[in-house]
Amino acid sequence: MKSDDKTYTQALSRRPLNVRRLWEEEPVGLFSGRDIFAAAKENRAIVLAANARHPITAKGVLRAAKKHDAAVLIEIAKSEANYCGSNFSNLPEYAVNYSRELGHGAVFAMHVDHYGIKGRDDVMKAVTQMGEVTARGWTSVAIDASHLDDWNNLCATRDVAMHIPPYFGLEVEVGEIKGPGEFSTVEEALYFIGGLNSWGIFPDLIAISNGSKHGTYDKTLGQNEGINFERTKAIADALKPYGVSIAQHGISGTNIETRCSQFAQYGIVKGNVATLFQNIVFGIKMEPETGNAVIEGDSYVKEADRGIPAELWDEIVAWCDGKGMSRKSGDYKKANLAFCDKILALPEKYLNRIVDETEYWTERFIKAFNAEGTAEKVIERVCRRTSWNPLPDRKIIAHRGDYRADNAPTKGGNDGGDYSE
């Protein structure tokens, strides 16, 4: 979309208040997740949510988004912000700067992914941190208290949500995303979303455990993508009265043209991709159909003509060896922070090939997700409202007394693992 388009210019005056406070004079197309999710849902499209573990990822994603007039999300998870160069403080500024380099016109939201809550201390910290992310220009949040049992998940999610501006996009989660074989149930989802509704909390999206996993599917161990579309649709259909759709996590390793292209049929509106974009930065060999990292000889395979230079990859391998990691470990993600500045300082030829490949894969997702043209739909939606505020016109239809600790579907807690991203 052209940054001087009349409707785009009109929509800029209706961006979220926190965005206008920071970038009133900057024609950056940063909007609320509420508007982007609603526009995608209306048009049977899926929004690509790209985890920018390295800031340069955001540039390639925004370039593809502008080229195809597709609304996207740039995101980072709470845990990722502790081991990546991107964090809650700097990623919005990086995204706005990259948008400026492109001449603006890209339509996107800044999404706090997997804001993990594992107990009371995290809830109390969130009271302060939600104010901080608002001040930094974020426009959407995913609360993830799925580590807790259903009753405490409901209570913690409710308490944190009450400290998020209601004009932000809101995603919640029930059932930890662990991989094939352990699925969220319709009963859990109805209890969770009904309970939130009874307190006046209106999520746009719910993340569920439906067979996907975060990170790499290790084919040498027989791991394969196993998204259960039937369970996904059953939950999506059950939640229609609440206006809640599905956020699909763990997409890296999923066939883009044959599987991702089906998502909209099953109530999915948002698609998260993280590890694939990290693979691009590092130049790790990937399956061409899925973006899953190829493992050979118990090791990732570095391709010399992709991503960072081989010499820098050797430094990363040595660093990870020093931390006791296997050479196919998912913990290679923790090298992002240690090597962020070195990557940003690389000669242009390396940065350009990272951005170019990021753009290529983003385009594939946009097309498979039927997301071309969704940026224009977001702008139209923003402009036809009587107010700038995208808070949806939903009603409380559930009764608080029906959602108690004693009738929660599950009473147990987490198994001790960390599946947050």
What are the language-model segments listed below?
Residues M1-R21, W319-E421:
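C-terminal extensions of enzymes
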Residues I46-A52, V72-I76, A106-G116, T139-I143, ...:
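Hydrophobic faces of well-ordered beta-strands that scaffold small-molecule active sites
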Residues A52, H147-C155, V174-I193, G250-E257:
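Active-site glycine- and acidic-residue-rich loops that bind
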Residues I76-H163, G169:
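Active-site beta->alpha loop and helix N-cap motifs at the rims of alpha/beta catalytic domains
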Residues F88-P92, D122-V127, S146-F168, Y217-A236, ...:
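Active-site-adjacent beta->alpha loops and helix N-cap segments on the catalytic face
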Residues G103, A238-I246, E257-I343:
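Catalytic-face loop-and-helix region of soluble metabolic enzyme cores
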Residues G119-E132, P180-S184, E188-A189, S252-G267:
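Catalytic cores of alpha/beta
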Residues R136-W151, N210-S212, T254-I256, Q265-K285:
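Glycine-rich phosphate-binding active-site loops on the catalytic face of alpha/beta enzymes
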